[in-house]
Amino acid sequence: MTRPLVITDCDEVLMHMVVPFAEWVDAEHGVIFRIEDASFANALKRKECGTPLEAAEVWPLLDGFFRKEMVRQYPIPGALAAMPTIGADADIGVLTNGGPEHQQGRIEQLALHDFHAPVIGSRGGKGEPVRRLMEQYQPSVAVFIDDLAGHHQSVAEAAPDVWRLHLVGEPAIADKIAPSPYAHARIDDWKAAQHWILARLAENIPAPAREPV
């Protein structure tokens, strides 16, 4: 019998990202990151004049952070502590939008916190990567965890049998992000999230069909 599968994002689910990123761009690049939501659109502004950075300027900053500054990140409370208990009942994979080029860095980052799991660095919507993981693992039941609503929609469309948990572990942005209508639950506390995940694994049934949104 195949084991259940838990597919989790990393940034703002397992590890804090926007706060250490904001501190870094402020100190090293003279840029203020106004944390209003999980989007980077118009969030980065030059300290000296307040003008927003263009998209072409934002992505090199993100790339630089993930290449050299991931050591600044620190775990979301309760997240990594929950992994051994969840891992006793399910395989765990980390699916991050950091891109393939940052995949090894993410593996090493998590290993420093004694969490060892397969990591997939993807781009764009996570629906297709989740669908491929479902084909690869053939799990008895699967749970997907992410902080971004768009990824829940993508997974709902590409892999509707997967349970979807919307979790925003960063308090600075959690109350600014509305619950995704494509997720089965919104829980931002890992103690409660662990109970919800373990309950889905114990039930061992596919996610129900989604009501029209």
Regions found by a protein language model. Give the residues of each.
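Short, acidic loop-to-helix structural element flanking the phosphoryl-transfer center
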Residues: G64-V94, E101-I107
